[in-house]
Design a protein with these regions (language model features):
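Helix-loop boundary and gating motifs at the non-cytosolic
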Residues: 1-50, 215-260
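Hydrophobic alpha-helical transmembrane segments
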Residues: 96-101, 107, 132-191, 260, ...
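Alpha-helical transmembrane segments and their helix-entry boundary regions
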Residues: 8, 24, 39-41, 70-71, ...
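Helix-breaking motifs and short loop linkers at transmembrane-helix boundaries and internal kinks
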Residues: 34, 66, 88-89, 303-304
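Membrane-helix interface/capping residues of multi-pass secondary transporters
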Residues: 5, 37, 67, 96, ...
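C-terminal transmembrane bundle of multi-pass solute transporters/carriers
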Residues: 53-57, 70, 74, 84, ...
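Substrate-agnostic recognition of the 12-TM MFS/MFS-like secondary transporter fold
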Residues: 6-23, 47-62, 66-81, 98-157, ...
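Juxtamembrane intracellular "pre-TM" segments in multi-pass secondary transporters
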Residues: 1-6, 185-224
């Protein structure tokens, strides 16, 4: 796949290890700081809110500067913020509001990191390798986060509450160094040399990204549909840690193990996605992924015990991994590389930027019943996905024709 992709992949592996540790430790820390379902859901909302506020300008920035520096800066800031949280825990000064503020900053860095990484794929790989490249990144994310990061987090958390956050901070620092070592020629260098005098203003870049997506009818519908379903997913999962621990009565020390088991489905989905797409067609597998995961979200609300819940979550992970990998390959095929940052930023503003609404709604619904967010989110997502099957089934041919 080449040295550029290998460095990107290595950085992704390290940052995913840090993410896995944080994903398991942060909810456990949160429920020791507050019993409020609304405050806990706000943490998830704060991670997603930057997609609404900053994805478009960050996307434009990604198309204008050396992308290594954006990756490095985002990891450096995450390292510093989580390091401060670890210090706050160790000294007994951390509060739920401190955690909420940190989640917002981490969310901004996630916007920059994700947008930049996705923009690099079509720059460093040939089109026929898009699905393979995305699959490798997804597999490493699933394996490292789910099978190493989460169990490691539980072990570290048992030793000392601050320890997983300290390790998380170190991981992001290493990812920063790896990002700076990626050996590729960047688009900005080409743009400056070829059109230095006519280089568009930053604001014009932002406007162009919005206009491009709006005028592309197929991409526009795909983004709007995905964004709506994303709100439902966010609603259904906002307080899931409380559901698992309080409703299904799982001991907190086993929470990381549950995340690991759930990751099996996502791992299998990531491995199978490129081969299944080649054999059955991208449109068919995308349709199965989005529809199946929506129905499974609803079914999770009816889980009578932790065993049924984990089985459903594992199937859901398989379906979502299929969808994510093939969706990214579709976007990377359709959107011109030199425009990818702007278009990706606009798309993520709608898709991920709307998720905080779902998180807050999920927290409000959970106040009445911890199962209610999954009922409501699952029903709405399933209705939208099923009613869009015809569109999803034709998505590959439509996007190719729309180019």
């Amino acid at each position: 796949m080449g040295p550029a992709f290998n460095r990107l992949w290595a950085g992704s592996i390290v940052s995913n290890l840090a993410d896995g540790v944080l994903i398991a430790a942060a909810p456990l820390l949160a429920i020791t700081l507050t019993d409020s379902t609304v405050l806990i859901s706000i943490i998830g909302a704060m991670v997603m809110l930057p997609w609404l506020l900053f994805a478009i300008p960050i996307g434009a920035l990604v198309d204008r500067v050396d992308r290594r520096f954006i990756l490095a800066a985002s990891n450096a800031i995450r390292s510093a913020v989580i390091g401060i949280v670890a210090l706050g825990i160790a000294t007994g000064h951390v509060t739920i509001f401190w955690l909420i503020a940190s989640a917002f900053v981490i969310g901004i860095c996630e916007v920059a990191n994700d947008t930049t990484a996705q923009s690099l794929i079509p720059q460093i790989l040939d089109e026929e390798h898009y699905e393979k490249g995305n699959s490798r990144l997804q597999i490493s994310e699933t394996v490292i986060q789910g099978f190493i990061g989460s169990p490691l987090s539980g072990f570290l958390y048992a030793l000392a509450m601050w320890l997983p956050f300290f390790i998380n901070s170190i991981g992001y620092a290493v990812a920063m160094l790896l990002a700076l070592s990626i050996p590729i020629q960047y688009l900005q260098d080409v743009r400056v040399e070829s059109s230095k005098e006519n280089k568009p203003h930053f604001v014009e870049d932002i406007k162009f990204g919005i206009k491009y997506l709006y005028n592309h009818k197929v991409l526009r519908r795909l983004v709007v549909t995905t964004a709506t379903i994303g709100v439902c997913y966010s609603m259904g999962t906002a307080t899931m840690v409380l559901f698992i621990i309080k409703e299904l009565e799982l001991a907190p020390k086993y929470f990381g193990v549950i995340l690991t088991i759930q990751g099996l489905g996502a791992l299998l989905g990531a491995i199978v996605a490129p081969k299944a797409s080649k054999k059955f067609g991208r449109s068919i597998m995308m349709t199965i992924g989005i529809t199946g995961s929506s129905v499974i979200l609803l079914a999770q609300g009816f889980a009578p015990n932790i065993y049924i819940f984990v089985a459903l979550a594992t199937l859901g992970g398989f379906a979502i991994a299929q969808w994510n990998i093939l969706l990214m390959a579709t976007y990377q095929t359709v959107i011109p590389n030199e425009l990818y940052g702007r278009i990706h930023g606009t798309r993520r503003t709608l898709v991920w930027g709307m998720m905080p609404i779902g998180s807050v709604l999920g927290g409000v619904l959970a106040h009445y019943s911890l199962r209610l967010p999954m009922y409501v989110g699952g029903i709405i997502a399933s209705v939208i996905a099923i009613s869009s099957i015809k569109f999803f089934m034709s998505i590959a041919s439509k996007t190719e024709a729309a180019q």
